[in-house]
A protein has these predicted regions:
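S-adenosyl-L-methionine
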Residues: 1-23
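A short SAM/SAH-binding and catalytic strip from SAM-dependent methyltransferases
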Residues: 22-43
Length: 127
């Protein structure tokens, strides 16, 4: 029932958070860094997923939304193969359908005009 907002690079904040404290993390329409030479700037990286796994409670959710298919493939490839996360999708409609309890952003509204919208959800294993 508590909420905190951090208006800066979350990667700086993650190491300071208490392990197992967070129930849900949203990454909504982050910069896809489409040029290959910039992929190291993407938020979803192995070390970032390690930090998310550390702070998420067992059964906690990491939700990722994008309108960039390359970015979606990148995040899916890393998170689905991470030992601490399980992709929750049961079928194609699961990743095409926005979460019922989601929060729209201005970038999502912009993305709705395009052909691609991807909503990925990963559950923290354990517990």
């Amino acid at each position: 029932d508590n909420i905190r907002l951090h208006d800066d690079d979350a990667r700086r904040l993650l190491p300071r958070l208490t392990p197992g404290l967070i129930g849900r993390v949203y990454l909504l329409y982050s910069d896809p860094w489409p040029k290959k030479r910039h992929w190291n700037r993407r938020f979803v990286q192995r070390d970032t997923l390690d930090q998310l796994a550390r702070i998420l409670a067992p059964g906690g959710l990491f939700r990722f939304a994008t309108d960039h298919m390359g970015h979606a493939r990148w995040a899916l490839g890393l998170a689905a193969n991470h030992p601490d996360f399980q992709w929750t999708a049961q079928g194609p409609e699961d990743w095409r359908t926005r979460w019922a309890d989601g929060y729209p952003t201005r970038y999502e509204e912009k993305g709705l005009a395009g052909p691609h919208r991807v909503y990925l959800e990963f559950r923290r294993r354990g517990g």
